[in-house]
Amino acid sequence: MFPLVEFCISNMAKGSDVVFEKLENDPNIDVLEYGCLQNCGLCASSLYALVDGDIVEGNTPDDLLKNIYQHIEDNDITNLL
């Protein structure tokens, strides 16, 4: 089972789409896009994604991508690394 990373389409329009596309090309991660993840305050203030249900944030797309991989590693989420 691979880590699941979920994105809000509104947040993707603010820049997390770059991260979505990079993760979509990683065969060891499952990614999903939703219309809304019900985190509107967070969505308005930063880039974020849900990683196996946990909120992971970043100030830039590169920060978000780095933080997602770090969260996966720190939490030993399956066989990614």
Swiss-Prot record:
Q: Which InterPro entries match?
A: DUF1450, UPF0349
- A matching Pfam family: DUF1450
Q: State the family it belongs to.
A: Belongs to the UPF0349 family.
What is the protein name given in its UniProt record? Answer: UPF0349 protein SERP0525
Record organism:
Staphylococcus epidermidis (strain ATCC 35984 / DSM 28319 / BCRC 17069 / CCUG 31568 / BM 3577 / RP62A)
Tell me the classification of the organism that encodes this protein: Bacteria, Bacillati, Bacillota, Bacilli, Bacillales
